[in-house]
Amino acid sequence: MTIASTASPVPAAAGLDRQSRNRRALRLWLGLVILALFALVLVGGATRLTNSGLSITQWKPIHGVIPPLNAAEWEEEFKLYQQIPQYELVNKGMTVEAFKTIFWWEWAHRFLARSIGVIFALPLVFFWATGRIEKRLRWPLVGILALGGFQGFIGWWMVSSGLSERTEVSQYRLATHLVTACLIFSACVWVMRGLARHSADPAPTAHSRHWAIALLCLVLFQIYLGALVAGLDAGMSYNTWPLMDGALIPGDLLVQQPVWLNFFENPKTVQFVHRIGAYTVLLVALYHMVSSLRAAPGTTHARRSVVLFAIVCCQAVLGISALLLQVPLDAALAHQGGALILLGFTVAHLRGFYGAYPLPKPVA
């Protein structure tokens, strides 16, 4: 009598369960990193809006973690600040106590940045060493870590632009710094979303995917424009809506020569372009939602497009409110936070077109 032997499903099931647990751990880790990045960008925004970014005039990646601890150290730090143009031309006569306020914003921003490096690097090493990271994700995660390290250099490059001749940082370098932060944020959201389960709904059309890609690019570009607005204090140029001081198109948008310079250095032009960018994002999000509802009604993809359009509308309201209120700190930070939420959801929405990362075959 011959007895047929079959492979037991238990090892395979155990392997899949282990992979699911590993993915859940990675999602929790990346979720923590994303929340920390969100906080970092908001603190960075507050640092810029309170003109605190030049309060620390030296780059000490390790020793700089420790702030001044006594009166003598505060005086020493304050003397360094008194040597730059911002103090001489903007804050002449500032007291040590007033200096402490702007110092703590910049210190908190740098401390958060260093902390995120630790929060990302140490778990990455642990997960890699214990085999919890799938091979396809190892080098992309290392790439994110490397980009984070490079972001530290970009931050100092930005600060250094305001230490010799200018009284504020270069808006070009500020925009580079913010966009790089958004790329790191987006990459973490992309990987985290790929590790989660996806809907079993039919795959969306290529047409919808192309528009989702376009929307993500527009959101990133709009954030870049927002950084130029912040760097030039362009939010104070026109504080009316929908018109700009009574006109749809003001007459002083192209006063600088050469003409292209207006789009980067004329505060009025930069605000105008940022407004046009917002309208463009709104229209593209509306079209994407309508086309998705028509092509795939009732699917998760279509519902996501509705949520995405709603977030765009909320962000537009936040932007208009900040403008009409003449850009108070709380309204400006709410608008910046809204931009990050919009960016994160747009990335997650686009990731939904590609589904979750396939699970590796478990080793029996």
From Swiss-Prot:
It is an enzyme of class 1 (oxidoreductase). One of its GO terms (biological process) is heme A biosynthetic process. Keywords: Cell membrane, Heme biosynthesis, Iron, Membrane, Metal-binding, Oxidoreductase, Transmembrane, Transmembrane helix. Heme binds at H274, H335. GO terms for cellular component: plasma membrane. It is found in: Cell membrane. One of its GO terms (molecular function) is metal ion binding. It catalyses: Fe(II)-heme o + 2 A + H2O = Fe(II)-heme a + 2 AH2. Pathway: Porphyrin-containing compound metabolism; heme A biosynthesis; heme A from heme O: step 1/1. Its cofactor is heme b. It is a multi-pass membrane protein. The chain crosses the membrane at residues 25-45, 111-131, 139-159, 174-194, 212-232, 270-290, 305-325, 327-347. Its EC number is 1.17.99.9. Belongs to the COX15/CtaA family. Type 2 subfamily. Catalyzes the conversion of heme O to heme A by two successive hydroxylations of the methyl group at C8. The first hydroxylation forms heme I, the second hydroxylation results in an unstable dihydroxymethyl group, which spontaneously dehydrates, resulting in the formyl group of heme A. PANTHER family: CYTOCHROME C OXIDASE ASSEMBLY PROTEIN COX15, CYTOCHROME C OXIDASE ASSEMBLY PROTEIN COX15 HOMOLOG. Interacts with CtaB. This is Heme A synthase. It comes from Allorhizobium ampelinum (strain ATCC BAA-846 / DSM 112012 / S4) (Agrobacterium vitis (strain S4)).
